[in-house]
């Protein structure tokens, strides 16, 4: 410290060395407009100990002709060796720092005024800011090192000086007169505390005005987690089960809390805004946002939980970016621990990410700390964001929700429901997803790769491609209290137990998960790539004459305008031909010209990738496609028959695709679709019977192409039932049936030349079997073997006969029958060998 001559000499050398690089100025000429009485002692107060900050203040005082902080100052009969002090005391020689203590210089000054007859002393708060205000800075590199609210280490301070030192700003604030405070007559100790409090509030308000608000709750929250009763209980149990000391268990809990907690930083939020503004404009052609007013309507007085669909890694940042740009607080975002990589993890954490392990199983202490952290966010009103699908969807479908985070949220609300929780679904639709090539490999069966920091460099190569637009639709909010009122009307009066785990929690959480998934799908952004993929993948060779493709796209648009999927869903502008031109400009379509015109098709690579974009909106077209399917093998069908078989099949389509309509609403919605199909001349109505067009007509082709949108889904349903019926009662477990379905689907895809790996996706069969169990069509015995209702075969054949062509049904039955024959041959060979 420059309190003595030899130290002042060293300080002077340091200041001259510093100013070989640093350039500083006062904010609003504040050093020149100070109204100080030079006949009375003047001392400067800085918030934190920093020699570099002091050197800058000393330089600005010299430039303005003010008393220098490093020079002695007379205080009555005494001499202070330097005219400055730090609000936070300097650390001792062991590096320890008493943040609650008062500066000895301030104590002496106050005593001189209050007890020793000194007329007055003037305290001038001074703040040093390295670099411009985050709101004014446009360099992402400088924003990354800009002043923030976190305590700065020496290396970071050095980096800040080197990067931001050319634009250093100093704010001199109006002097505080100690005489005015002493005359309030509160006594020495209380006046000392009051001065400290005034200075703390002053520095905080000034810092907020210059660098933005302190968005971080980390410094106080992390230690507070360990004082929570449920965490204390978990620490005690950890001590007993692991036979470790209380101190060690607390250290483990503190390590978990630091691993989890986010560390919001306003400069980093600005840094990400600058980077992402460039990114969206460079890679994507902007972001289209719909229904954001729904968030603005519920933001006041509610705890907001954003639940986006998960298609890409950039989903993490996209929502925060949009909310920040629209004047809403960015949320705390749940991110997988695999993203806590060097450098990137730190940026994400300061951008609002909190990190969670993939599994909490068997670690009660981690579970308690994580649950308490999330409860603290909710109870304090911090908006949050997590992905109910868990991971990114590699197929483009809405993945079946994972209920872990929803269960934690629900339990937190049961624990403290004073602040209402509102879920806001956010549908994110890409015309070309950044990880498309990676997904292509995984769709073809490649092993899922672990994320790495080096994956970021792959983005550079993608910048040359055209990625179109990003669509972000905010769905209809779900009010948790209203949801509970519907499903557990007396939830507020129940004894929920010390851990808030009522018996109905799992079932209610599952219902909530399905509601969230349906609301997400309700907000689908239907874009040109989705529609073109849907149309071309419905053909046998993924190819259509350009005029025919334009007609079917016009049909899709007309149908969706006549029967909108939901008030939250959006459609692209333009007609079919405009959509084709747009998709061609993205190099997603190949073309071949001949004398009759132009044929547009998907090459092998784009055909597989197109399944991803088709699946984004398959739920939107599933019901009209199911209706059209009834006319593949039937020239006419009565409304009564159509409704009966549609009701039989719909629950499975709804469960797989999270379609919005309940079974009670189904008849009315089908009537709307039938009317729309009649209006487009795809069907003709005679009394209560609907008749398809002549097979040679253009309308018939359009109807069949629409039907084929769900053909593969219906084939998978029929496949599982055929294998189950062939095996007989109590012959297969659910896992065995799932494996058989996968093998059978692979064989059929080879036999029929299907280039669609998701056709034999194991998870789709697993969820179909689970739906059969949920609807009590199947039952498990004590050994886990499956039995089925006696009428299952009759119902399955009756429905399949009406929605699947005869050759497909025959092919599935033949492959299903081959399995018993193969097993019999294997048993015969084993017997002969013995």
From Swiss-Prot:
One of its GO terms (molecular function) is glycerol-3-phosphate O-acyltransferase activity. It holds the Pfam family Acyltransferase. GO terms for cellular component: plasma membrane. It is an enzyme of class 2 (transferase). CDD domains: LPLAT_DHAPAT-like. It is a peripheral membrane protein. Keywords: Acyltransferase, Cell inner membrane, Cell membrane, Lipid biosynthesis, Lipid metabolism, Membrane, Phospholipid biosynthesis, Phospholipid metabolism, Transferase. It is found in: Cell inner membrane. Its EC number is 2.3.1.15. GO terms for biological process: CDP-diacylglycerol biosynthetic process; fatty acid metabolic process; phospholipid biosynthetic process. A motif (HXXXXD motif) lies at residues 310-315. It comes from the Bacteria. SMART domains: PlsC. Pathway: Phospholipid metabolism; CDP-diacylglycerol biosynthesis; CDP-diacylglycerol from sn-glycerol 3-phosphate: step 1/3. It catalyses: sn-glycerol 3-phosphate + an acyl-CoA = a 1-acyl-sn-glycero-3-phosphate + CoA. The HXXXXD motif is essential for acyltransferase activity and may constitute the binding site for the phosphate moiety of the glycerol-3-phosphate. Belongs to the GPAT/DAPAT family. NCBIfam families: plsB, PRK04974.1. This is Glycerol-3-phosphate acyltransferase. The lineage of its organism: Bacteria, Pseudomonadati, Pseudomonadota, Gammaproteobacteria, Pseudomonadales.
């Amino acid at each position: 410290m420059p309190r003595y001559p030899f130290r002042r000499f060293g300080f002077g050398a340091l200041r001259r060395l510093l100013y070989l690089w640093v350039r500083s100025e006062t904010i609003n000429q504040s050093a020149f407009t100070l109204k100080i009485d030079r006949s009375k002692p003047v001392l400067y107060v800085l918030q934190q100990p920093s020699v570099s900050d002091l050197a800058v203040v000393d330089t600005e005082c010299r430039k303005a002709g003010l008393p220098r902080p490093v020079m002695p100052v007379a205080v009555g009969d005494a001499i202070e060796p330097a005219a400055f002090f730090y609000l936070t005391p300097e650390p001792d020689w062991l590096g320890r720092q008493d943040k609650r203590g008062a500066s000895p210089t301030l104590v002496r000054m106050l005593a001189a005024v209050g007890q020793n007859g000194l007329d007055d002393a003037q305290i001038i708060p001074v703040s040093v800011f390295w670099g411009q205000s985050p709101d004014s800075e446009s360099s992402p590199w400088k924003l990354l090192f800009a002043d923030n609210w976190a305590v700065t280490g020496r290396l970071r301070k050095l980096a800040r000086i080197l990067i931001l030192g050319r634009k250093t700003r100093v704010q001199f604030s109006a002097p505080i007169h100690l005489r005015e405070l002493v005359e309030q007559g509160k006594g020495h100790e209380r006046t000392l505390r009051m001065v400290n409090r005034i200075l703390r509030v002053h520095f905080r308000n000034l810092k907020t005005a210059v660098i933005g608000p302190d968005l971080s709750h980390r410094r106080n929250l992390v230690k507070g987690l360990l004082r929570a009763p449920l965490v204390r209980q978990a620490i005690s149990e950890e001590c007993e089960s692991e036979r470790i000391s209380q101190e060690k268990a607390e250290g483990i809990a503190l390590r978990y809390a630091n691993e989890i907690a986010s560390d919001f930083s306003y400069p980093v939020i600005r840094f990400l805004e600058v980077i992402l503004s460039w990114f969206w404009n460079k890679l994507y052609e902007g972001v289209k946002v719909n229904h954001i007013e729904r968030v603005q309507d519920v933001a006041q007085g509610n705890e907001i939980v954003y639940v986006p669909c998960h298609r890409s890694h950039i989903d993490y940042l996209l929502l925060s970016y949009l909310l920040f740009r629209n004047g809403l607080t960015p949320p705390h975002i749940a991110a997988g621990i695999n993203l806590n990589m060097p450098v990137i993890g730190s940026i994400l954490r300061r951008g609002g990410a909190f990190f969670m392990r993939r599994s909490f199983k068997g670690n009660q202490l981690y579970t308690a700390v994580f649950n308490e952290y999330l409860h603290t966010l909710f109870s304090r009103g911090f908006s949050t964001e997590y992905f109910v699908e868990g991971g990114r969807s590699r197929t483009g479908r809405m993945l079946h929700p994972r209920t872990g985070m929803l269960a934690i949220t629900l339990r937190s609300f049961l624990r403290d429901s004073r602040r209402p929780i509102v879920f806001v679904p956010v549908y994110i639709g890409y015309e070309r997803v950044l990880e498309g090539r990676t997904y292509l490999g995984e769709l073809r069966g490649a092993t899922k790769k672990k994320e790495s920091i080096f994956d970021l460099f792959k983005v550079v190569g993608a910048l040359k491609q055209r990625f179109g637009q990003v669509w972000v639709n905010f769905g209809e909010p779900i009010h948790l209290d209203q949801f509970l009122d519907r499903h557990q009307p007396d939830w507020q009066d129940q004894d929920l137990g010390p851990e808030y785990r009522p018996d109905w929690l799992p079932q209610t959480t599952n219902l909530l998960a399905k509601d969230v998934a349906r609301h997400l799908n309700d907000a689908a952004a239907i874009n040109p790539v989705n529609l073109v993929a849907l149309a071309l993948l419905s053909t046998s060779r993924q190819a259509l004459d350009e005029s025919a493709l334009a007609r079917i796209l016009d049909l899709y648009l007309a149908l969706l305008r006549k029967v909108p999927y939901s008030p939250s869903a959006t459609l692209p502008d333009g007609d079919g031909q405009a959509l084709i031109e747009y998709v061609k400009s993205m190099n997603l379509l190949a073309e071949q010209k001949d004398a009759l015109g132009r044929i547009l098709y998907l090459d092998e690579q784009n055909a597989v990738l197109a399944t991803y974009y088709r699946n984004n909106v398959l739920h939107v077209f599933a019901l009209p496609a199911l209706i059209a399917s009834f006319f593949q093998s039937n020239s006419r069908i009565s409304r009564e028959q159509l409704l009966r078989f549609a009701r039989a099949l719909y629950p499975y389509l709804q469960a797989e695709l999270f379609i919005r309509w309940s079974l009670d609403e189904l008849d009315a919605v089908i009537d709307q679709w039938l009317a729309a199909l009649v209006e487009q001349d795809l069907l003709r109505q005679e009394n209560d019977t609907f008749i398809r067009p002549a097979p040679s007509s253009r309308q018939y082709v359009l109807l069949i192409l629409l039907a084929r949108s769900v053909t593969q889904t219906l084939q998978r349903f029929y496949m599982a039932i055929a294998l189950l019926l062939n095996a007989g009662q109590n012959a297969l477990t659910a896992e065995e049936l799932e494996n058989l379905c996968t093998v059978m689907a692979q064989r059929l895809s080879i036999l029929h030349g299907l280039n669609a790996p998701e056709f034999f996706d194991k998870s789709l069969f697993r969820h179909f079997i689970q739906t059969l169990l949920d609807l009590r069509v199947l039952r498990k015995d004590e050994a886990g073997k499956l039995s089925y209702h006696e009428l299952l075969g009759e119902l399955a054949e009756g429905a399949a006969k009406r929605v699947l062509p005869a050759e497909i049904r025959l092919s599935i039955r033949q492959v299903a029958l081959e399995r018993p024959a193969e097993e019999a041959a294997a048993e015969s060979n084993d017997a002969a060998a013995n």
